[in-house]
């Protein structure tokens, strides 16, 4: 994921900053506690496509 896209994209729930996790191919919203998947280079920024982040993941 290119930095220029990360500068533009925000969490659709909180409108907050997202973190790119290359190893999991996800964009994380710590504020919403959601991880949005990236499939074939395309971020799926729908709340119903996201998975809930676990407490252990949020500590990292």
UniProtKB/Swiss-Prot annotation:
Matches recorded under SUPFAM superfamilies: Trm112p-like (SSF158997)
Family per record: Belongs to the UPF0434 family.
Name this polypeptide is given: UPF0434 protein NMCC_0628
Provenance organism: Neisseria meningitidis serogroup C (strain 053442)
GO cellular component: cytosol
């Amino acid at each position: 994921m290119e930095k220029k896209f990360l500068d533009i994209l925000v969490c659709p729930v909180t409108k907050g900053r997202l973190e790119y996790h290359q190893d999991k191919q996800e964009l994380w919203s710590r504020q919403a506690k959601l991880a949005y998947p990236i499939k074939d280079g395309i971020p799926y920024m729908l709340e119903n496509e996201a998975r809930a982040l676990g407490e252990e993941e949020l500590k990292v």
